[in-house]
């Protein structure tokens, strides 16, 4: 059975993440080459540039691994095939979101991107939740150890400081040998342009009403930049 191995080309200029100096920071001097992709819905593809992932980029040390994913298995699966635990450790079948557009994000409380992303995610959810949008937040502590708190602390932070009303789930790994199955699916379904690795906090996956991943956005893409893509899927 045919399989496809994903490359590690990453299509967007990842610039300064404004992290605390005590944590490692992404490389800011990455070479750019003209992309062969003519167009895309995503703002970073529209820039027309691509770049190779730098070995200096702060990914999970020693745990990351490349793997091939069976093409038919990807085609046959949807997000609805997975059950995850919510922030209170209760099982949640993602089939409950059938027929909705999903924006899935790995979040962190102490990242330079935290404030802008939580604020904009909350606005998007407020504006489109009654039209069929769900934002699903998965806390992750793999990038700079920027989500160290307990589930209760994470929930308190998001719901109190940013008035987050969208679902927040149990803390997960998004890379490495302990990657949550739902993230194995998300990464496998989003093609070879990004490779297997989630690059940093607040990488985003857009899932259509049929449970299929239709777009993947780098951490530096703000939620507001995704609004038009969300509206198109909601109208479909």
Curated annotation (Swiss-Prot):
It catalyses: a hydroperoxy polyunsaturated fatty acid + 2 glutathione = a hydroxy polyunsaturated fatty acid + glutathione disulfide + H2O. Coiled coil: none annotated. The lineage of its organism: Eukaryota, Viridiplantae, Streptophyta, Embryophyta, Tracheophyta. This is Phospholipid hydroperoxide glutathione peroxidase, chloroplastic. SUPFAM superfamilies: Thioredoxin-like. GO terms for molecular function: phospholipid-hydroperoxide glutathione peroxidase activity. Pfam families: GSHPx. Belongs to the glutathione peroxidase family. InterPro entries: Glutathione_peroxidase (IPR000889), GPX_AS (IPR029759), GPX_CS (IPR029760), Thioredoxin-like_sf (IPR036249), Thioredoxin_domain (IPR013766). Keywords: Chloroplast, Oxidoreductase, Peroxidase, Plastid, Transit peptide. CDD domains: GSH_Peroxidase (cd00340). The keyword Transit peptide applies. It comes from the Eukaryota. Residues 1-64 form a transit peptide. The active site is at 111. One of its GO terms (biological process) is response to oxidative stress. Its main location: plastid. GO terms for cellular component: chloroplast stroma. Its EC number is 1.11.1.12. Protects cells and enzymes from oxidative damage, by catalyzing the reduction of hydrogen peroxide, lipid peroxides and organic hydroperoxide, by glutathione. The keyword Iron-sulfur does not apply. It is found in: Plastid, Chloroplast stroma.
């Amino acid at each position: 059975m045919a399989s496809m191995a994903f490359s590690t080309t990453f299509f967007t200029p990842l610039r300064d993440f404004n992290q605390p100096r005590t944590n490692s920071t992404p490389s800011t001097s990455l070479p750019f080459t003209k992309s062969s992709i003519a167009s895309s819905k995503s703002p970073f593809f529209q820039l027309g540039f691509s770049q190779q992932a730098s070995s200096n980029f702060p990914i999970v040390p020693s745990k990351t691994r490349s793997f091939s994913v069976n093409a038919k298995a990807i085609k046959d699966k949807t997000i609805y095939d997975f059950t995850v635990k919510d922030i209170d450790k209760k099982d949640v079948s993602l089939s409950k979101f059938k027929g909705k557009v999903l924006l899935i994000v790995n979040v962190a409380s102490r990242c330079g991107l935290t404030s802008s992303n939580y604020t904009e995610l909350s606005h998007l959810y407020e504006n489109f939740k009654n039209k069929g949008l769900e934002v699903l937040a998965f806390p992750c502590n793999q990038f700079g150890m920027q989500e160290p708190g307990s589930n209760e602390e994470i929930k308190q932070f998001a719901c109190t400081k940013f008035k987050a009303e969208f679902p927040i789930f149990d803390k997960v790994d998004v890379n490495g040998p302990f990657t949550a199955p739902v993230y194995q699916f998300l990464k496998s379904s989003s093609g070879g342009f990004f490779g297997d690795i989630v690059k940093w906090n607040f990488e985003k996956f857009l899932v259509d009403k049929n449970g299929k991943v239709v777009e993947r956005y780098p951490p530096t893409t703000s939620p507001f930049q995704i609004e038009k893509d969300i509206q198109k899927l909601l109208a479909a």
